[in-house]
């Protein structure tokens, strides 16, 4: 595979925030860039390129033939921003050698509307890490 989600020897992944002006079609989002990235109006809680995610690794289920990757929740503290989308992307590892662009996209999260935080904490809480709910699931 092009992305290595192993918690011990896998690639490094980040989560960046974007405004509702970002075009998020599969052909438009191939990797991280600063176009329409959420700006930090005040405070120091969000910087360009976002947060590094803690990768909890890959788990599988032999009964359902579904594997899933999981990340720990991540927070931006003392942040003032408005975001609609989050991009999970591979920030280091095998992307270039696997033929992918540097900072290649894994997935886009849509918050369903603008989410505004003013001098507060914005937490991205990942769903239950299981075969029905995990953000990244692969069946075989």
Regions flagged by a language model, labelled:
Residues 1-84, 91-140:
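Small cysteine-rich, disulfide-bonded extracellular modules of the LU/uPAR three-finger superfamily
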């Amino acid at each position: 595979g092009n992305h290595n989600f192993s918690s011990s020897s896998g690639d490094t992944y980040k989560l960046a925030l974007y405004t509702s002006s970002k075009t998020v079609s599969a052909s438009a989002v191939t990797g991280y860039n600063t176009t329409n990235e959420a700006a930090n109006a005040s405070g120091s809680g969000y910087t360009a390129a976002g947060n590094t995610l803690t990768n909890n690794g890959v788990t599988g289920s032999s009964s359902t033939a579904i594997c899933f990757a999981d990340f720990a929740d991540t927070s931006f503290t003392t942040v003032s921003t408005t975001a609609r989308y989050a991009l999970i992307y591979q920030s280091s590892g095998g992307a270039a050698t696997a033929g992918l662009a540097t900072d290649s996209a894994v997935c886009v999260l849509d918050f369903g509307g603008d989410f505004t935080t003013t001098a507060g904490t914005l937490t991205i809480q990942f769903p239950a890490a299981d075969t029905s709910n995990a953000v990244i699931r692969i069946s075989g």
